[in-house]
């Protein structure tokens, strides 16, 4: 049973990168996330898109799992690759 959460949030895609951003989230990024899950780093995830509200947080995902495994995931090269790629596509990216 999950006792912790890893938050990955963003503002919006960089102008002109909208298609690339959503393709990444729906294909390569999803494949990477599924591999992290298969490797036991987290138990489940949720994706959330927010309606327009004038703020700078417009979408996020939550990875649910055990704190030690989520901490371990954050230190893997594969997760760093995922975050760095997402950071080239999404403005205001943050991982907490």
Which stretches of residues belong to each language-model region?
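Short S/T/G/P-rich N-terminal loop/turn motif that feeds into the first structured element of a domain
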Residues: 1-57, 65-75, 95-96
